[in-house]
């Protein structure tokens, strides 16, 4: 007799292998036909708002793993919020203006951009940006991100530009925006100012110099002995800035010494705290301290410049420290913010002896026309020959580089537009207190950056950007930005785009009949600079979120760690400055960088990069999503083929668990779940463990801890289900009667587990969970079209076992662990084959073990151990039994011998009361109900 056909060995249409690269595109098509994003909004319309505002990626290249990590996390946030009952609008955005696109278009098309009409050049930039919006959008769609792809916001869109102009106007009206000559980061390779967020620091080798500035005028304060052969010794790492020196700064309260070099009679002024170090660097071994004075004593003395015909003034500054150098600080107002402020305080004129191209001007004398880096060795040689070089050293220091061209930059004073952050720093810091920061240290980082930052340079000497909406009166020369001009420019930009600024003359752009508010003049010029790209992206909360989406503030901002000084900060500053509100986000979350498998930065030159498109083709987008969902994204996230291979193995465990459930639910109707009172205790144990999973995952989703969700689901699949529950219930599912209460109990639990597990993992494993959902039987209240259109399962409180009952079950599983160890020994000794061939006898040697055996009396131990018989009351182990002590219970003795009775040919369990066909009573009853004909 072939009994296989009498077993409940059903098969679903769910394949064991995912075949994700082939299957996912079909699912994307299904989602598109379903219009999943809008269906999701309809489903939760009128419910509490969860608004993730998309930090715009720059539209200048294909997708990289940083993009993938960022968009995966955002999609996890949106999907999980939707499935927890929130209304979740999600508008993707792109940042379009800026130097990287200009540079790329010039290089790609070999353009002479300076000879091109500006509107024509800007149109080429626009097309370039739009191309990469399309490229990136397709990549994000392939990743499975649910968003309003039909209506993204773009900072180059006329509607956006029209609103950004209003942000500028509001800040100008409040007096927060001004034009001034101040030192800013300057890339002379690209000939533009840079913001702090556009700076990258790299370790560069350099020559540091200690330079002697001979005393010129002591203001009658020094004795004859003190001023004899006296020089003020400064230290600098930027030799090329020395032509711009106007002053030497001392700390007013620190002690300074005049030191005589007994070898050559020269005298030097240095800080006493640094004297020994300076003398050692200069090779001066025999020296004498002539006198001591506080720094304030030397104020307004004059020193001769070491190689130019001019003097340098001794000034005081609190920022002069005793950490390094000489205590006498080289001060060039055209090349440093502190230098600028100090010289301004002393009424000195601004001197900027370097032009836009990074070349010295005529002010630098013989060095005129030289690039700054070319002048370094020439100046060094001249100082050596003139005897003004005290010492020099070779060091490696951290130096700022342009984020785009990767070349060193300079600090240089130029006429620029600034946002006076000082005016509202306190308000910006106070706004941080109302934000939930993840990680929690984010608030301290943001506040420190705001407090320490200088005024924000918002102008750029570029063409591809939003024009600064300021006019100049030709009669009085004053800048003009009024409510009337802002309204007119906003209207024009909204209708025609910002190219109109470059296509029309100023007189055509101002309001009709407009006159200068300062002098009544009627003729105007336009500002030629464009706005910093960070002003663009910093305006998205107003230009896109508030205007187009109708909400403010956002629930959450999520971006990389670098955005504390980038988008997070620019958004905060424009919100506080322009709108007079708090932060534009209630929560601020950061993620780390993506790095290679060894933790190194990924670079094309190193060949260690990972292309998301390759991951999609080889493994599927769900594996990429699982990578993002399995990582502690607050720190750097490693990425390599080996990691994806391992994740694929973890993925198969989840998929195989789902397949097991689906295969055993093909004949099950979840509208008729077994009632709690009728459900088998083991099944209720599994549901109680499921409840624990659901509670843990709900808390994790609230805190955006997706790693916790992934690990919890994986542990539940591997430990709770595969290793225990699913293995134990196979007999009931396959061998009990199809409609028996015991089998329906197991199926009910299986359905509850699969339903809840699929929903709880759906935000992360979007494609696979939806594939499972489409295969599952559903209740009447479920939406069968897509798993994300359903709410996450709440814990099944009515099915939960009591704490005492759960303790008893945990005891049973600890006993099972000890029994399994002895079964393995018996199998290795060939005493038994399958575990169903075993009879297990348990013996307690101490009170704890006796109590454990007493606690599990009500539990069906043969079912739990997957053996034919279990006894706890035998006097001694059977002769020939394999006997071992327990591990979980050292007072336990486990004896394994051959099972008593006859092996049932249908279920393979041994029975002492078989029927005439050798069937155990259970199988005999099932076969009878099936009207099995025995030949």
Stretch-by-stretch model annotation:
Residues 2-20, 26, 30-34, 106-243, ...:
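Residue patterns forming the tRNA-binding/recognition surfaces of aminoacyl-tRNA synthetases
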Residues 42-103, 234-241, 315-342, 346, ...:
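N-terminal catalytic cores of NTP/NDP-binding nucleotidyl/phosphoryl-transfer enzymes
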Residues 44, 48-55, 66-69, 73, ...:
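Secondary-structure capping and boundary motifs in well-ordered enzyme cores
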Residues 95, 184, 188, 194-200, ...:
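Acidic, turn-prone loop/beta-hairpin segments
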Residues 187, 402, 473, 516-519, ...:
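Short cysteine-rich clusters marking metal-coordination/redox-active sites
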Residues 191, 461, 477, 520, ...:
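Cys/His-coordinated zinc-binding microdomains
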Residues 215, 346-358, 462-464, 486-636:
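Alpha-helical recognition segments enriched in aromatics with Gly/Pro capping
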Residues 247, 254-328, 337, 341:
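Protease-associated
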């Amino acid at each position: 007799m072939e009994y296989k056909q009498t077993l409940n060995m059903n098969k679903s249409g769910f394949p064991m292998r995912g075949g994700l690269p082939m299957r996912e595109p079909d699912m994307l098509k299904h989602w598109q036909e379903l219009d999943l994003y809008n269906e999701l909004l309809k489903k939760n319309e009128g419910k509490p708002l969860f608004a993730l505002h998309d930090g715009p990626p720059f539209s200048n290249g294909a997708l990289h793993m940083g993009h993938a990590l960022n968009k995966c996390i955002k999609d996890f946030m949106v999907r999980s919020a939707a499935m927890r009952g929130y209304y979740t609008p999600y508008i993707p955005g792109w940042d379009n203006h800026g130097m990287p696109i200009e540079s790329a278009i010039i290089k790609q098309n070999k353009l002479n951009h300076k000879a091109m009409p500006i509107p024509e050049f800007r149109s080429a930039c626009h097309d370039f940006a739009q191309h990469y919006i399309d490229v990136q959008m397709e990549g994000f769609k392939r990743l499975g991100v649910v968003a309003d792809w039909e209506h993204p916001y773009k900072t180059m869109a006329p509607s956006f530009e029209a609103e950004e102009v209003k942000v500028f106007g509001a800040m100008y009206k409040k007096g927060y925006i001004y034009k001034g000559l101040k030192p800013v980061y300057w890339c002379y390779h690209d000939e533009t100012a840079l913001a702090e967020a556009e700076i990258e620091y790299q370790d560069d080798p350099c020559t540091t110099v200690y330079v002697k500035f001979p005393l010129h005028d002591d203001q009658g304060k020094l004795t004859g002995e003190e001023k004899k052969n006296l020089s003020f010794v400064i230290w600098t790492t930027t030799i090329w800035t020395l032509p711009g020196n106007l002053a030497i700064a001392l700390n007013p309260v620190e002690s300074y010494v005049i030191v005589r070099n007994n070898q050559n009679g020269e005298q030097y002024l240095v800080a006493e705290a640094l004297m020994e170090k300076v003398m050692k660097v200069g090779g001066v071994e025999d020296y004498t301290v002539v006198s001591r004075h506080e720094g304030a004593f030397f104020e307004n003395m004059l020193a001769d410049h070491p190689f130019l015909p001019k003097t340098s003034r001794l000034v005081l500054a609190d920022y002069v420290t005793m950490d390094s150098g000489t205590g006498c600080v080289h001060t060039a107002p055209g090349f440093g913010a502190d230098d600028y402020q100090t010289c301004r305080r002393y009424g000195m004129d601004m001197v900027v002896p370097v032009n836009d191209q990074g070349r010295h001007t005529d002010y630098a004398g013989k060095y005129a026309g030289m690039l700054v880096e070319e002048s370094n060795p020439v100046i060094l040689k001249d100082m050596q020959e003139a005897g003004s070089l005290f010492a020099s050293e070779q060091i490696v220091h951290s130096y700022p580089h342009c984020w785009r061209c990767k070349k060193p930059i300079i600090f240089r004073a130029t006429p620029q537009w600034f946002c006076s952050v000082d005016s509202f720093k306190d308000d910006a810091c106070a706004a941080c207190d109302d934000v939930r920061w993840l990680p929690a240290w984010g608030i301290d980082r943001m506040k420190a950056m705001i407090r320490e930052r200088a005024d924000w340079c918002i102008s750029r000497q570029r063409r591809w950007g939003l024009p600064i909406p300021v006019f100049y009166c030709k009669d009085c020369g004053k800048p003009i930005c009024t409510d009337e001009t802002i309204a007119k420019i906003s209207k024009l930009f909204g209708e025609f785009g910002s190219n109109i600024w470059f296509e029309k003359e100023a007189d055509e752009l101002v309001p009709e009949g407009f006159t200068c508010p300062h002098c009544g003049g009627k003729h105007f010029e336009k500002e030629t600079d464009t706005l910093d790209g960070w002003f663009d992206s910093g305006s998205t909360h107003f230009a896109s979120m508030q205007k187009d989406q109708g909400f403010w503030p956002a629930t959450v901002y999520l971006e990389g760690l670098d955005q504390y000084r980038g988008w997070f900060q620019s958004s905060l500053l424009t919100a506080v400055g322009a709108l007079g509100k708090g932060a534009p986000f209630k929560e601020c979350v950061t993620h780390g960088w993506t790095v290679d498998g060894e933790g190194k930065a990924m670079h094309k030159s190193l060949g260690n990069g990972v292309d998301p498109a390759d991951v999609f083709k080889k493994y599927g987008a769900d594996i990429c999503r699982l990578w993002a969902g399995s990582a502690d994204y607050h720190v750097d996230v490693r990425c390599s083929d080996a990691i994806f291979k391992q994740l694929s193995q973890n993925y198969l465990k989840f998929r195989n668990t789902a397949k097991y459930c689906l295969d055993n639910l093909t004949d099950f109707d979840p509208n008729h779940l077994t009632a709690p009172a009728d459900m088998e205790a083991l099944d209720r144990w599994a549901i109680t463990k499921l409840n624990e999973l659901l509670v843990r995952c709900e808390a994790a989703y609230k805190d955006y801890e997706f790693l916790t969700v992934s690990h919890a689901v994986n542990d539940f699949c591997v430990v709770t289900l595969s290793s225990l529950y699913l293995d134990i219930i196979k007999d009931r599912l396959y061998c009990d009667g199809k409609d028996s209460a015991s089998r329906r109990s197991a199926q009910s639990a299986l359905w509850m587990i699969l339903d809840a597990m699929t929903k709880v993992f759906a935000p992360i494993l979007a494609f696979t969970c939806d594939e499972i959902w489409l295969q599952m039987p559903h209740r009447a209240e479920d939406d069968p079209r897509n798993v994300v259109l359903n709410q996450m399962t709440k814990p099944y409180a009515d099915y939960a076992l009591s704490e005492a009952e759960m303790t008893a079950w945990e005891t049973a599983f600890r006993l099972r662990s000890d029994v399994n160890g002895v079964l393995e020994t018996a199998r290795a000794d060939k005493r038994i084959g399958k575990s169903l061939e075993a009879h297990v006898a348990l013996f307690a040697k101490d009170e704890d073990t006796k109590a454990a055996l007493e606690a599990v009396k009500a539990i069906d131990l043969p079912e739990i151990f997957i053996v034919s018989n279990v006894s706890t009351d035998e006097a001694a182990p059977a002769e020939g039994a394999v006997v071992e002590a327990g591990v979980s219970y050292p007072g336990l003795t486990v004896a394994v011998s051959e099972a008593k009775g006859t092996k049932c040919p249908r279920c393979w369990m041994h029975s002492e009361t078989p029927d005439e066909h050798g069937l155990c009573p259970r199988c005999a009853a099932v076969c009878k109900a099936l009207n099995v004909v025995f030949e």
